[in-house]
């Protein structure tokens, strides 16, 4: 993601470069922020019978956000408060900004907040892990998943339903099908890396049909996707997604309860004392109570703590949500 921050004007200019960037922009936009940029909307000047859709530069005051994780869609709705010169009758009406890849927008924050932490969060987008197309396969089932720093999306599950009596052609036809699906997904998703995982024998055989890194594990199919994520075979991915920090939190919760804070009240007390080493916060909580959530994030950043924003739809996000949406590992 390309971005610039004007700390005096509280303005952030961003250009999303990949779908994951839209998620981080979604996190940064709060209700009341002003969003500026080029957009297309219907315009009907006075005296004209029929309007037409034209490109114009305008600003809205954000009232609602709609983000779809793997659809690559981020929309911001609100009333128009500024419009380019020469365009009449648009100001005051409602408009929806479709924030898309490659298009610059400007976000003006509605409160005087320290923008250093905004810079830190935007850096998360710049340092995202490679996008992985994971093919988890055994002789009965193949599952395809798209893994990015913002989550795991299971795309397809294919059963090997060929007749067992067909012998050697059974596996060949199955692997040909898997290879065709893999090529289609590679063209559509343009992943940075393809990883094939499953029992060693099948992984070696699929290598003739799909090019990619091979990782042997005990099971394939849908169960193999979850084993891959749990096993730490790509430790860097687990670190970026906050999984390792969560695992450490749970270990300390069982062995040294005094070194963790669970829930908003405990975490706020720990933050006030400067004790927080790592903060884990669920993304949905940031939208539910943005004032308190950002206050925590800013204070942890100011005391050089590490911040992980966890997606609620991840397994660890569901667990953190049950803890109150926020937890932390303490320095002492």
From Swiss-Prot:
- What GO molecular-function term can you cite, just one? endonuclease activity
* Annotated compartments: Cytoplasm
Single GO cellular component term = cytoplasm
According to its UniProt record, the EC number is 3.1.-.-
InterPro entries linked: eFR1_2_sf, eRF1_1_Pelota, eRF1_3, Pelota/DOM34_N, Pelota_arc, Ribosomal_eL30-like_sf, Transl-rel_pelota
Known cofactor(s)? a divalent metal cation
GO BP term, example? RNA surveillance
Q: What is its main location?
A: cytoplasm
- Tell me where on the tree of life, at the top rank, the source sits: Archaea
List keywords of the entry alphabetically: Cytoplasm, Endonuclease, Hydrolase, Metal-binding, Nuclease
Record has Membrane as a keyword = no
Q: Name one Pfam family in it.
A: eRF1_3
Subunit comment for this entry? Monomer.
Report the protein's function: May function in recognizing stalled ribosomes, interact with stem-loop structures in stalled mRNA molecules, and effect endonucleolytic cleavage of the mRNA. May play a role in the release non-functional ribosomes and degradation of damaged mRNAs. Has endoribonuclease activity.
Domain comment from the record reads as follows:
The N-terminal domain has the RNA-binding Sm fold. It harbors the endoribonuclease activity.
Q: Which family does it belong to?
A: Belongs to the eukaryotic release factor 1 family. Pelota subfamily.
Please state what the protein is called.
Protein pelota homolog
**Gene that encodes it:** pelA
